[in-house]
From Swiss-Prot:
UniProt entry keywords in alphabetical sequence: Amino-acid biosynthesis, ATP-binding, Cytoplasm, Glycosyltransferase, Histidine biosynthesis, Nucleotide-binding, Transferase
Gene3D superfamilies: Periplasmic binding protein-like II
A Pfam cross-reference name: HisG
Assembly with partners or alone: Heteromultimer composed of HisG and HisZ subunits.
Localization, UniProt: Cytoplasm
The keyword Protein transport appears for this protein: no
Encoding gene, per UniProt annotation: hisG
Protein's recorded name: ATP phosphoribosyltransferase
Top EC class, one word: transferase
PANTHER family reported in the protein's UniProt record: ATP PHOSPHORIBOSYLTRANSFERASE, ATP PHOSPHORIBOSYLTRANSFERASE ATP-PRTASE
EC number: 2.4.2.17
Originating organism: Methylibium petroleiphilum (strain ATCC BAA-1232 / LMG 22953 / PM1)
């Protein structure tokens, strides 16, 4: 009974490796040097598939993978339908925030009820956040380089992930509101959990025992 785990390259992949090791699983090829999108492990019954971060929930939901590791930001935007979400893995931590140009008075715009143009790739999350606060916004969907939007006049504000804040600072942007803290979650295909329970449940338990403590 084989198990397929969906991961994205980069920080999530690197920070998932110690959790896999705790479960007795080691990826035997480096994704940065290998051209393969399906990576073998030291266990013949476990393989890792490399997909875009935004595609991880879709692969797991539709059975392309049995499990996956995905950021809460992606999961919320996806909606999480058809996914069992047993664990907050507490890795790849950052925050989702609102940021503006240094010369834009965000608080005044909100107070006056002005319509604010906001660029983001997290349209669903941003829409819910501003609706809850009663802030009038026009949302502009972008896929990258969010910091450019206020600098070019495309938007008044952005909603994006922030780790250290250095990128915002380098582009003369100010973080004015924290929407939520973000970390990565383990997601499991619900059908796979039933059909492959004897193989999947020990993995979940091993991950749980290896989660970094606060």
């Amino acid at each position: 009974m084989s198990i397929t785990l969906a991961l994205s390259k980069g920080r999530i992949f690197e920070e998932t490796l110690p959790l896999l090791k705790a479960a007795g699983i080691e990826v035997t090829e480096d994704p940065e040097t290998s051209r393969k999108l399906i990576l073998p492990t030291n266990r013949p019954d476990v393989r890792v598939v490399l997909v875009r971060a935004t595609d991880v929930p879709t692969y797991v939901q539709h059975g392309g993978a049995d499990l996956g590791v995905v950021g809460l930001d992606v999961l919320l935007e996806h909606g999480g339908q058809g996914l069992y979400q047993p664990l907050d893995l507490r890795i790849a931590k950052c925050r989702m925030s609102v940021a503006v140009r240094a010369d834009f008075d965000y608080a005044a715009a909100v107070k006056q009820g002005s319509r604010i143009r906001v660029a983001t790739k997290y349209v669903s999350v941003a829409r819910d956040h501003f609706a809850d606060k009663g802030v009038h916004v026009d949302l502009i969907k972008l896929y990258g380089s969010m910091e450019l939007a206020p600098l070019t006049g495309l938007a008044d504000a952005i909603v994006d992930l922030v780790s250290t804040g250095s990128t915002l600072k380098a582009n003369h942007l100010l973080e004015v509101e924290r929407i939520m803290d973000i970390s990565s979650r383990l997601v499991v295909n619900q059908a796979a959990l039933k059909l492959k329970r004897e193989a999947i449940r020990p993995l979940i338990d091993a991950f749980a025992a290896a989660i970094p403590q606060e």
